[in-house]
UniProtKB/Swiss-Prot annotation:
GO biological process per UniProt: thiamine biosynthetic process; thiamine diphosphate biosynthetic process
Record-given protein name: Hydroxyethylthiazole kinase 2
Binding locations of ATP: 115, 168
Annotated function: Catalyzes the phosphorylation of the hydroxyl group of 4-methyl-5-beta-hydroxyethylthiazole (THZ).
Recorded superkingdom: Bacteria
Glycosyltransferase in keyword set: no
EC numbers for this chain: 2.7.1.50
Species whose genome carries this gene: Clostridium botulinum (strain Hall / ATCC 3502 / NCTC 13319 / Type A)
Length: 265
């Protein structure tokens, strides 16, 4: 829990280039974690912004020519300055444009964390996926039958890229190729509002600013799931969204320790 306390104390600046659909919620979840968001995306300023930030997040949702240019500039700046960065592979399972771009970004910017659902992770690894738009396809969902083979694929992707891989879903799998963790927190409501995956990427960006990449990623993923569970009895999706941010802001270490469901593989 030292990472949480460090973030709250230091309030690191987090540069997050995301989509207009979820940008407000992403900024607020970063604030709730104790960090400071900046959402700059103009190609002429992003290098300067990234260079003074403590971490970078890039999100492939709702991409544009300018945003693609900006993310690559920021990613290279982060890599050159040893600033931790995470890429969210939104939609690479259904869009060749995004898939080709993600491969280029990973090759040239070497992100510390690659995050996506199982359809997106399979696509970036080069395996045919059954993505349903930006959502995971039914055939790609992790089951008891495909659990081991999916874990091995995630580990290989991590070793080949040098990145921590975070495969999110009903069960979350996070690996750096050597250590692999399975997190079973979360609730259905998290999939019933738009932007929770984007918010998680902002949270990962916040916690990896501590430079403890694997632990920061694990903490972010577990916290999102736990806060979802704490919020799931809300009246509806609107109040759930608000309670999710409230719980992220107020959750104690004791509750995290009590609620977390994590196993090593």
């Amino acid at each position: 829990m030292q990472i949480r306390q460090s973030i709250k104390l230091k309030k690191p600046l987090i540069h997050y280039i995301t989509n207009p659909i979820s940008i407000n919620d992403c900024a607020n979840i970063i604030l709730a974690a104790g960090a400071k968001p900046i959402m700059a995306e103009h190609p002429l300023e992003v290098s300067e912004i990234t260079s003074v930030s403590k971490s970078l997040g890039v999100n492939l949702g709702n991409i544009t020519d300018n945003k693609m240019k900006s993310m690559l500039i920021s990613g290279k700046t982060a890599y050159e300055n040893k600033i931790p960065q995470v890429i969210d592979l939104v939609g690479v399972g259904c869009s060749k444009l995004r898939l080709d771009y993600a491969k280029k970004f990973i090759s040239e910017c070497h992100p510390n964390v690659i995050k996506g659902n199982m359809s997106e992770i399979k696509a970036i690894y080069g395996i045919k996926s059954s993505a349903k738009g930006i959502d995971v396809g039914a055939c790609d969902i992790i089951t008891k039958q495909n659990f081991d083979e999916n874990i091995e694929m995630i580990k290989r992707l991590s070793m080949e890229t040098g990145s921590v891989v975070a495969a999110t879903g009903v069960v979350d799998i996070i690996s750096n190729g050597t250590y692999t963790y399975i997190i079973s927190n979360g609730c259905e409501m998290l999939s019933m509002i738009t932007g929770t995956g984007c918010m998680l990427t902002g949270l990962i960006a916040s916690y990896i600013s501590s430079e403890n990449i694997l632990d920061g990623t694990v903490l972010a993923v577990a916290l999102m799931g736990i806060c979802g569970e704490l919020s799931q009895h809300a009246k509806g999706t609107g109040s759930f969204r608000n309670e999710l941010t409230d719980n992220m802001f107020s959750i104690s270490d004791d509750i995290i320790i009590k609620k977390i469901r994590i196993n090593s593989y």
